[in-house]
């Protein structure tokens, strides 16, 4: 879901 919301950067950073 995060990827669809555009929070991919946060996931990559470990958030």
From Swiss-Prot:
Entry keyword Glycoprotein: no
Regions annotated as coiled coil: none
Role summary: Acts as a primer for viral genomic replication. DNA terminal protein is covalently linked to the 5'-ends of both strands of the genome through a phosphodiester bond between the beta-hydroxyl group of a serine residue and the 5'-phosphate of the terminal deoxyadenylate. This protein is essential for DNA replication and is involved in the priming of DNA elongation. Hydrolyzes host peptidoglycans during virus entry.
Alphabetized UniProt keyword annotations: Covalent protein-DNA linkage, Degradation of host cell envelope components during virus entry, Degradation of host peptidoglycans during virus entry, DNA replication, Early protein, Hydrolase, Phosphoprotein, Viral DNA replication, Virion, Virus entry into host cell
SS bond list: none
Any one GO biological process: DNA replication
Name this protein carries in UniProt: DNA terminal protein
Main location: virion
Keyword presence, Hydrolase: yes
MF terms (GO), sorted A to Z: hydrolase activity
Superkingdom in the source lineage: Viruses
């Amino acid at each position: 879901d995060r990827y669809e919301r555009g929070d991919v950067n946060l996931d990559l950073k470990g958030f």
